[in-house]
Amino acid sequence: MKINAKNYFKINKTADVTPTNNIVRLATKVQIGMLESQDTEKEVTELDAMKNGLELQDDMADFVQRVMGYTDKQMATINDTVSIEQFGEGVGYLIMRLNGISDADIKLSEQKQRKAMADAKSSK
């Protein structure tokens, strides 16, 4: 499948991605890390939370580089110019694409999320 994540990572490169076993495993590892970082019931010290967050960021960067085929220099540019929120959205986009979701469906989903967030802010 062809994937271009310019909207998230600011690099105009279309990658021809095959969801290999290693890529799917890395995507799953990232998803698990993201879910664990949101688990508010799990007792974690602040230090462990910071360590886990740093490990998750490294895993996410490895995943993006592996899927998109970015060079180390391109990854350095991404890390210096893209916010952590936008980077996380880009990782989510790549995972959805690897799961077979179309660009059109992803765009629709993102629009619904933004509207829900805007509605939540305006109702406060």
Regions found by a protein language model. Give the residues of each.
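C-terminal charged interaction modules
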Residues: 72-124
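Short N-terminal mixed-charge amphipathic segments
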Residues: 1-54
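An amphipathic alpha-helix signature
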Residues: 57-61
